[in-house]
A protein has these predicted regions:
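Substrate-binding/active-site clefts of carbohydrate-active enzymes
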Residues: 284, 288-290, 300-346, 368-380
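Conserved beta-strand positions
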Residues: 270-271, 355, 360-362, 408
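Conserved structural scaffold segments of CAZyme catalytic domains across common CAZy folds
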Residues: 55, 59-317, 340
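An acidic- and aromatic-residue-enriched active-site/binding cleft used to recognize and process polar
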Residues: 13, 129, 139-141, 273-275, ...
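Acidic-aromatic substrate-binding/catalytic surfaces of carbohydrate-active enzymes
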Residues: 3-86, 91-95
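Glycan-recognition surfaces
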Residues: 312-325, 329, 333-337, 344, ...
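An active-site-proximal structural segment forming one wall of the substrate-binding cleft
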Residues: 248-249, 259, 334-361
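Alpha-helix-loop-beta-strand connector modules within alpha/beta enzyme cores
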Residues: 288-301, 383-404
């Protein structure tokens, strides 16, 4: 830092910030000698008690300090990972601190720049240092004035709801609540956060990751994206081979374990249709599952189970429903008294059975909810943030701290999810064997453009899974193998 200017550089990218007003004056792609920023601009904003403030609206520079890069998700390496380095990635990290005397707020801007990788991480934190409570409506993790070379910048955040982006619509390369407003790039939730801070309490913005491409070639760019995920979310390299078991009997579980151990599969997941109940608190039931899972562990097989967290277009039990403005019930709300109890129940199952994996069907997809008496959010506008925070961020953090593998059909990798679908339609499993193989090859080809192979799962239905009869089955394999 020199004369009020902070410079972060690693030979691939360089970002220069004036501490006065926290204004980014340069964001340069050193691989191509291209400048992205058109004009200096405060690189955050925060809305407090209904009013929006940027870095130039009363925030005074207090200090900056070098800090270690953060382990954002608890990480435990497994034998089936192909992780390419340590986590968190080595690099440089700084925190720039500001005070707003009138609001009695301390604001911290955190930048991380990683060695050998053209990626910058940015997050903003707001702390109440006054006596009165304040409400933080929304925080923009990053704001940049960019009109040229937009296609050289890929922006992702942990505030995610997409199943996949497949690399097919990447004209702006800004996804997951990173959006352009004319010439401004803003990384912020689409709706308000609505977090009340008492004295001494702190809230963090969503986390932005910004990758500067080194090439114009489309497929090479996607290779760079995949390389970024391997470094900032190394759990997504866990390329475990798992078997979906559709039975809950002890004998069937032990038989599946024996078969997996014999052929080299590494995990058994009691899947949809198995009858497993991860919400059960019955001690006798949990002890039976524990004994079956212990048998799997003795054979070197990781064990897990399926749970339905969220589903659209059904009428849930009263109290946990997400409500439209017209009062119609469209799905569960994952910020209710019920959802908190649900998460506790599933976590208890994992703790008491020794499960290594959980298959979360219907992870939160950013649906909105009008709220009600049993809801842990205020209204429609803050429902998205609070559901995401409770059902994704906090829960996944707790699961990863236990070393649990998370199989979930949504793009929650930056919060700890290991794998999502590589692309499929369940009805395809009712097609003839030959057609299933053709369809699967199409999905695997397209689905690995924008994600690493280890980030996606697909199925080979040995038995009838979705209809189709004998022509859709691969068992018996000796009879149905292809010449």
């Amino acid at each position: 830092m020199s004369k009020g200017k902070l410079t972060l550089a690693n030979g691939l990218v360089r970002r220069e910030i004036l501490t006065d007003g926290c204004r980014t004056v340069s964001f340069c792609n050193l691989q191509r000698e291209e400048e992205l920023v058109d004009a200096p601009h405060s690189d955050f904003w925060v809305s407090v008690n209904g009013k929006k403030y940027s870095g130039e609206d009363g925030f005074e520079f207090a200090e900056f300090k070098a800090v270690p890069c953060l382990e954002r998700v608890p990480f435990q390496k497994t034998a089936t990972m192909t992780v390419e380095g340590p986590y968190p990635p080595p690099g440089k990290a700084v925190e720039v601190r500001y005070l707003h005397r009138a609001l009695q707020l301390q604001l911290t801007v955190r930048y991380e720049l990683y060695d050998g990788m053209p990626v910058l991480m940015k997050q903003v934190s707001v702390k109440n240092v006054g006596r009165e409570s304040v409400t933080v409506d929304t925080i923009a993790a990053d704001v940049l004035q960019i009109t040229q070379h937009r296609d050289m910048l890929f922006v992702d955040s942990d505030y995610d709801s997409t199943t996949d982006f497949l690399g097919l619509e990447l004209s702006k390369y800004a996804k997951n609540y990173a959006r352009y407003q004319y010439d401004m790039l803003e990384v912020a939730p689409a709706y308000r956060m609505n977090v009340k801070l008492e004295k001494g309490e702190e809230v963090h913005s969503i986390t932005a990751y910004e990758l500067l491409f080194g090439t114009d070639y489309y497929e090479h760019r996607l290779i760079e994206v995949k390389g970024m995920y391997r470094r900032i979310a190394p759990w997504c390299t866990d390329n475990v081979l798992f078997f979906h078991l559709i039975s809950n009997s002890t004998a069937a579980i032990r038989k599946a374990v024996d078969q997996c151990a014999e052929v080299g599969l590494e995990m058994v997941i009691q899947s949809f249709g198995s009858g497993v109940n991860m919400e059960s608190g019955n001690e006798r039931y949990l002890n039976r599952i524990r004994a079956a899972y212990d048998y799997g562990h003795q054979k070197g097989i990781r064990m897990g189970a399926y749970t339905l967290a969220y589903v659209k277009n059904y009428r849930p039990v009263r109290g946990d429903e997400a409500l439209n403005h017209d009062g119609s019930h469209i799905c569960r709300c994952l910020a209710t008294d019920w959802s908190r109890q649900y998460i506790q129940n599933v976590t208890r199952f994992i703790d008491q059975t020794g499960a290594d994996a959980v298959e979360i069907d219907g992870p939160y997809g950013m649906m909105l909810c009008s709220g009600g008496k049993t809801h842990c959010h205020e209204d429609f506008t803050d429902s998205q943030y609070h559901q995401w925070k409770e059902a994704v961020v906090d829960w996944y953090q707790a699961l990863k701290a236990r070393g649990v593998y998370i199989n979930a059909p949504d793009w929650h990798f930056l919060n700890g999810s290991n794998r999502s679908g590589v692309g499929y339609e369940e009805i395809a499993f009712s097609e003839r064997r030959e057609e299933q193989l053709i369809t699967s090859r199409i999905y695997y080809y397209k689905g690995t453009f924008s994600k690493n192979p280890s980030q996606g799962w697909g199925f080979l239905p040995l038995n009838v899974y979705h209809g189709g009869g004998k022509d859709a089955m691969f068992f018996p394999t000796e009879q149905n193998r292809f010449a």
